[in-house]
């Protein structure tokens, strides 16, 4: 993967679900909404000064949210941050940079 360029979309892994779970409360607060279903479906990764994860999450009722989560470099010892999100997405919507 080239630094700065997002990877191809890949199926979600256990690590992807863990990342999504760690920012779920941030999303619920920002979106003013609770999600009973929260299952990562796919993701893209972008290496910058840290890593951006673009994650498509199934939130039930045929709807998805797209998350952009920033993971700082390990030596910075900082938590994951929900940088941005898109609601009212569907499973067929492409996961792109936002």
Curated annotation (Swiss-Prot):
PANTHER family in UniProt: CYSTATIN FAMILY MEMBER, CYSTATIN-B
Leader sequence residues: none
Motif Secondary area of contact per record, residues: 46-50
CDD domains the UniProt entry points to: CY
N-acetylmethionine found at: 1
Main location class: cytoplasm
Residue numbers marked as site, Reactive site: 4
SUPFAM superfamilies: Cystatin/monellin
Localization, UniProt: Cytoplasm
Name listed for the protein in its UniProt record: Cystatin-B
Organism: Rattus norvegicus (Rat)
Gene3D superfamilies tied to this protein: 3.10.450.10
Membrane-spanning residues: none
């Amino acid at each position: 993967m080239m630094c700065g360029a997002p990877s191809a979309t890949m199926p979600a892994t256990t690590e992807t679900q863990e990342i999504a779970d760690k920012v779920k409360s941030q999303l619920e607060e920002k979106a003013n909404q609770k999600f009973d279903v929260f299952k990562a479906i796919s993701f893209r990764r972008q290496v910058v000064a840290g890593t951006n994860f673009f994650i498509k999450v199934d939130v039930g009722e045929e709807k998805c949210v797209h998350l952009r989560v920033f993971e700082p470099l390990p030596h910075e010892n900082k938590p994951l941050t929900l940088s941005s999100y898109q609601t009212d997405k569907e499973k067929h919507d492409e996961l792109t940079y936002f």
